[in-house]
Amino acid sequence: RLVNAGVRGASSVADSSRMQVMIHLDQGGRYFYLKEWFDGALRAGLMDFDLIGLSYYPFWHGTYTDLKETMERLVEEYRRPIMIVESAYAWRKCEKGFIDEAQERIAGFPASPQGQRRVLELVNGITASLPERMGMGVFYWEPLCQPREDSGGWDANMGLLDENGQVMEGIHAFSFTREGFDPSAWAKVYEPQSLTVHTGTPAALP
């Protein structure tokens, strides 16, 4: 009822002939979580909607393979275009920053300007690869975050501006075009593998 009331409220003050309704959920790489929500909401009488919006942060919401498979299955299941309406990655590690080494390992890229750009290129590429041009784009949250003296949290290392207010190379990920998309340029994503290690012996990595 609350979601439907929000849709009706927006429709009452907007041009209903142009307004589109998006359902925005987190957990962009968790298909079964999202399916459970949509199926439950539709059974409960969710009004029609036009777009699916997802949040995807690679250190929280699953692997890049999870994201790709989730988006493909949602398109097949609900026949709605999809956008990534929240995504971000760190451009550095710092004491007060948001990304630590554990999250950096989960995301699979270093917390650096180059790593930030690569994550964004990968998320853009996955979105563009959806069948029938159903991937509509990617929004960054929050590009204008800038480190300030004694600031911590998201501002410290998750924006697209460095400590001097200069735009970093991650912005170039948004010059992406569907026509210029090259699947061969993707990073290879490896699934988890079992590994046995012994103290004092170098591990043989797969």
Over which residues does each language-model region extend?
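Glycoside hydrolase catalytic-domain groove-lining segments
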Residues: 4-23, 32-104, 115, 121-135
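Short, internal active-site loops enriched in acidic
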Residues: 26-31, 143-147
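Aromatic-rich peripheral "rim/lid" segments of glycoside hydrolase catalytic domains that contact
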Residues: 69, 73-76, 92-122, 126-206
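Extended hydrophobic secondary-structure segments that form protein cores and membrane-embedded regions
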Residues: 21-25, 139-142
